[in-house]
Amino acid sequence: MLSANITKRLPGISIEVSFDFDRGILVIFGPSGSGKTTILNCIAGLREPDKGHISLDGRVFYSSADHISTPARSRRIGYVFQDYALFPHLTVKDNIMYGIPSQCKKGKNYRIGTLDVLEMLKITHLQNRYPAQLSGGEKQRTALARALMVEPDILLLDEPLSALDHGNRKALQGELRELQRVWRIPFVLVTHSRKEMHALADEIIFLHKGKKETHVFPDMRRAGLDLANMSESSPTYAVSGFTV
């Protein structure tokens, strides 16, 4: 289980968020500037909260009370960035392997191979190409493959579909659901897209100006808050100034 209690003050916004999440895909939904990416960065160890507590399956990543701050490289977290963050001078295969310890590259103490990940994401035929030769969807699959190569205990995704065309977006939505089912680790995805939220979320946190407005759990959806089947003409679910 991911347990997060994060306080972080930034120019123009104060983030105060607390939540627990166990399985499936958690979507953090909110407008631009609401603090979504900062929350991911705090979980990943790329930014330190001002105070709070972050743990995963009992392993404490950050605790202001106990003066604990685990380095990002030791957290076993996969992170897919909004801009792909691929190295232009490296091939797809080398991008995927970047940062993997040398003993793992030789197959020692490592459960998954590069070809396994390439095949899983249907990009084996691209392994010797460079990022400039890839489409947006191919770049995103490469970024996903790199995040999975570290065998993460949780996967963070920052607006992973925002730059893709409709066809690639629909395809990757299905692939993300299948990846989560196969890997059986929590996914935390942030988006400002209502359609992505409907397509992907098992649980939803509505974020507004750095604060959690509502946490929608699976049992709430089963009880009648069926967000996935809402249409443009349906009553909207309003959360402090924006609707879904």
Kindly label every feature range from the protein language model.
Residues 90-99:
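Short coil-to-helix segment of the ABC ATPase nucleotide-binding domain corresponding to the Q-loop/switch region
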Residues 149-153:
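A short, proline-enriched helix->beta-strand linker immediately N-terminal to the Walker B motif
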Residues 155-159:
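Catalytic Walker B motif of ABC-type/P-loop ATPase nucleotide-binding domains
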Residues 61-78, 102:
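ABC ATPase NBD coupling module
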Residues 184-190:
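Conserved H-loop
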Residues 130-134, 138-140:
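Conserved ABC ATPase signature
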Residues 59-64, 108-126, 177-178:
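Conserved ABC ATPase "signature" region
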